[in-house]
Amino acid sequence: MRNVQAQPLVSPTEPMIDPFGRAVTYLRVSVTDRCDFRCTYCMAEHMTFLPKKDLLTLEELDRLCSVFIEKGVRKLRLTGGEPLVRKNIMHLIGNLSRHLKSGALDELTLTTNGSQLARFAGELADCGVRRINVSLDTLNPEKFRTITRWGDLSRVLEGIDAAQKAGIHVKINAVALKDFNDAEIPELIRWAHGRSMDVTLIETMPMGEIEFDRTDQYLPLSQVRADLASQFTLADIPYRTGGPARYVTISETGGRLGFITPMTHNFCESCNRVRLTCTGMLYMCLGQNDDADLRKALRESESDEHLSQAIDEAISRKPKGHDFIIDREHNRPSVARHMSLTGG
């Protein structure tokens, strides 16, 4: 890696502003398209992964992230695929942590399936990672193996324990799936809140190849919330984490529950984020196909000025909203790329 010594404390940079007046302060970076699970709503079972030569190096990822931070990004989330299966990923995380120490970055975090957490939790905490999201749709070992196609639930639970013992706050992300985990959502909430973990429920999104009718899988969170309201006392709160979730508190558990509703309640009006893939493609919107090739700009010049200009041009094309829709007639997604490539 290039010289990444800690810099003195810096003043916050003015954020990038998109055509609709929204400040872009949040960068999600997919560091790999590979994963040790094959979740049915995320990727195909026999996935064809990108050749390693097409991936940005760790040094290039560091440089790109650093330019975004110089341009006003305050929150950086590493995703995948599964970010912790990327070789030498802790070198990248350790180097990016200098931006926390300098004050240029408010938060460095990641979304993980939890399979590698037992191994890396201590190092993550040492690098200044204070919060992580763990994707977990069920506490039933057989169902877990079905949805992930071969995942080991006990390994994930061990990873969550390790993260909490290391002082990392864990939030559980669960995709609500009709006739799969809808009946056990209350149990998942009680379990998580009993361990001081927030829960965020997510509507399934029409992305990537699908092996069965996506409409059969889709469960509107408005329905889930109504069902939960018959068991719990829900109260809306203004709590935000920088993402699109809207939160409530549950009186009976004392915990927080978030709802991410791309289908039933468009969250685009407050969108503050862009997504960078492991190949250097920048997506200004999760639900649009428009992209910008930052790898080309990165490799054309050692100067960051050309790269900065390419980022500015991309931000100028950030759309007002996504085009997510489930095509009920042809059983196909509105966005063809897999979530594992875009960054979950």
From Swiss-Prot:
Gene name? moaA
The record lists S-adenosyl-L-methionine as bound by Y41, G81, S135, M205
* Ranges in a coiled coil: none
Cofactor binding mode, per the note? Binds 2 [4Fe-4S] clusters. Binds 1 [4Fe-4S] cluster coordinated with 3 cysteines and an exchangeable S-adenosyl-L-methionine and 1 [4Fe-4S] cluster coordinated with 3 cysteines and the GTP-derived substrate.
Give the enzyme's main class according to its UniProt record, as a single word: lyase
Its job = Catalyzes the cyclization of GTP to (8S)-3',8-cyclo-7,8-dihydroguanosine 5'-triphosphate.
- InterPro entries in UniProt: Aldolase_TIM, Elp3/MiaA/NifB-like_rSAM, MoaA, MoaA_NifB_PqqE_Fe-S-bd_CS, MoaA_twitch, MoCo_biosynth_MoaA/MoaC, rSAM
Recorded superkingdom? Bacteria
Q: Assembly state and interactors? A: Monomer and homodimer.
Q: Which residues form the Radical SAM core domain?
A: 19-245
Q: What is its EC number?
A: 4.1.99.22
Query: Which classification does the entry list for the species?
Result: Bacteria, Pseudomonadati, Pseudomonadota, Alphaproteobacteria, Hyphomicrobiales
Q: What is this protein called?
A: GTP 3',8-cyclase
Binding positions for [4Fe-4S] cluster 1 per the UniProt entry: C35, C39, C42
Q: Which organism is it from?
A: Brucella ovis (strain ATCC 25840 / 63/290 / NCTC 10512)
